[in-house]
Amino acid sequence: MNIKIQNQWKIIKQLGKIFEDNGIPYHFDGSTAVFAHGIEFDMDDIDIVFPFDRVNEVREFFNEYKPSEIGSIQNLGLKYFHFYINDEKIHCLFYEGPYENFSIEDVEVIKDGQKIWAKSLNFYLRYAKEDDVLVPRIHKLLNTK
């Protein structure tokens, strides 16, 4: 396992512990969810989804990392910000609406004893583009379970 992937795992487990210890609902999303299921690759950033009403709380929680200003995409009902831990970009996303709508297909993954919440691999497959390089690896993993 290369150093970058080791660093990404360390950060994901560290963040999972922080959120679990502080009762903050979350899930790793997009390709980060695929990574959390054990399909390792060099990610561009780490994507995490939180309840919409927790944006200020979560941002304040990571003040020491100097998070960006809160941005928004109105037509998507999305707020977001990012920060860096050990040169890894952490992208925090907050969608309008009840969090339950966004956590329906969250699954618990255990990595080295640490609970991590991530979108299911089947959820990722439903929304993946045809040429997504992760799709064959996901099918292979699902077929071995």
Predicted stretch roles:
Residues M1-F28, H139-N143:
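Helical scaffold of the NTase/Pol beta-like nucleotidyltransferase catalytic core
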Residues L15-I46, P51-F52, E57:
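Active-site nucleotide-donor binding segment shared across nucleotidyl transfer reactions
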Residues N22, G77-K79, E105:
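Residue-level marker for the onset of beta-strands and adjacent loop->beta junctions
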Residues E57-V58, I70, S120:
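Vicinal oxygen chelate
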Residues V58-Y65:
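Short amphipathic alpha-helices in soluble, non-transmembrane regions
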Residues P67-E100:
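Conserved catalytic core of two-metal-ion nucleotidyltransferases
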Residues E100-K145:
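Catalytic cores of NTP-dependent nucleotidyl/adenyl transfer enzymes across multiple folds
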